[in-house]
Amino acid sequence: MRRCGKCKGLMVKSIRPEHTEDLGGVVVTVLNAVQVYHCSTCDTDMVAIPDMDGLAYATAISRALDPIRLRGREVKFFRRVLDMTQTEFATAMNLAAAETVSRWENDTRGVGGACEKLTRHNVCALLSKMARGRPYDPAVIAKMELVEVAEDYVPPPLKMVRVRVTDAAADGDSWGEMAAAAA
């Protein structure tokens, strides 16, 4: 049993059926995986999301495979998930200057169609081995028709679940998107 950091009382663990979290540019709803530790003495809750890095990797791939045009906050999310500076990201995306990445992230200039597809491919390729629960097929992006949406459009949260993964590398749990996990 865990002890409360405030009052040292015992904390009771439960699993939250749904938990919505902003990962810094992309919002996800985590299903049946978030652990909540509740202290009945001081009424404090502590929330724990397992494998946050894996959740971020799988979320980035899921967003890259969604045909809705990328916004600046999502490009920034990709870069942060890849743990890159703007200069490193520009180099990885084969861009001439880091200023281009800055313009994309600040929505000063949108990502052009060809650059957007290349960015999506690169993000998926760089993360696919780390997000074993979220498969990536390059043909999906190659055939993708990008969808324009209104500037004030707020996308629904991506629904993410823990999935059991068995492969040559290792067995274990990983993150997958709800729609992809059901398929």
Question: What are these regions, as identified by a protein language model?
Answer:
Residues 1-68, 128, 133-148, 160-164:
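N-terminal flexible/basic segments that precede or flank functional cores
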Residues 75-88:
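Short basic helix-loop element that most often maps to the first helix and adjoining turn
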Residues 85-102:
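Short alpha-helical DNA-recognition segment
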Residues 93, 104-108, 115, 123:
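DNA major-groove recognition helix of helix-turn-helix
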Residues 113-132:
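DNA major-groove recognition helix of helix-turn-helix/homeodomain DNA-binding modules
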Residues 140-183:
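Charged, low-complexity regulatory segments of eukaryotic nuclear chromatin/transcription proteins
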